[in-house]
Amino acid sequence: MSSTDFKEQFLKNNQPPIFVKLLAMLSLVRWYNVLLVTTGLYLSSIFMLQDHMPKVDVIKDISLHINVVAIAFLIMAGYIINAFYDFEKDLINHPESTVFGTVISKQFCLNSYIFFLFVGSSLSILLGWKVGLFNLLFSSGLWIYSHKLRQKPLSGELGASILTVAPFASISLHYMQHLQYPIRG
C-alpha cells in the first residue's frame, strides 16, 4: 500500500487506521510512566521481601504479576480520565498534540477508561478483598484527583503525593495479607 493509497483510505473513511488509534492510546495512557512504575513495583517487591523469600520465588509469584498488571491497568485508567477532564484546557494550551476529537473520540476514551477500570478492579479482587478494596479506593482517588483536587493548591499536591505512593502500598498490603512474615520497613 503506497502512501497515497493510505491517505485516500484515511480521507475516504474519515477514520484514522487502527494502528494510529493504538499509538494515540499509548500516548494517552503514558506507557513510559506505567513501565517505570511497574519496574519500581517489581524492584520494591524483590527488596522488601529479600529477608523472607528468595528473589527467584518473588519473581515466580503469580500473584505479584497479577497485582502489578492490575495496578498498571488502574494507572492507565487514571491517565485516561485525567486527559478526559483536561480536554478543553489542552485544546487551548496545545491544540496540535490533543488526541481527542482528531485521532480518538471522547467516547472511545471513556469506553477505554471503563474497560481498564474493570480489568484492573477484577484482577485486584482476585487477590483478596483487602487488596481489591484498596485498589478500588486507589482508582476512586485517581478519579477524584482528576475531577476535583488537581485545581486546588494544597490538596492537589497532597493528593498527587498519596496517589504516587499508593501502588507500592498495594503491593505491601498484598504481601502482608498472603505471607506469614511481616514485611520489614
Describe the residue ranges of each PLM region.
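Multi-pass alpha-helical membrane architecture of UbiA-family
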Residues: 1-185
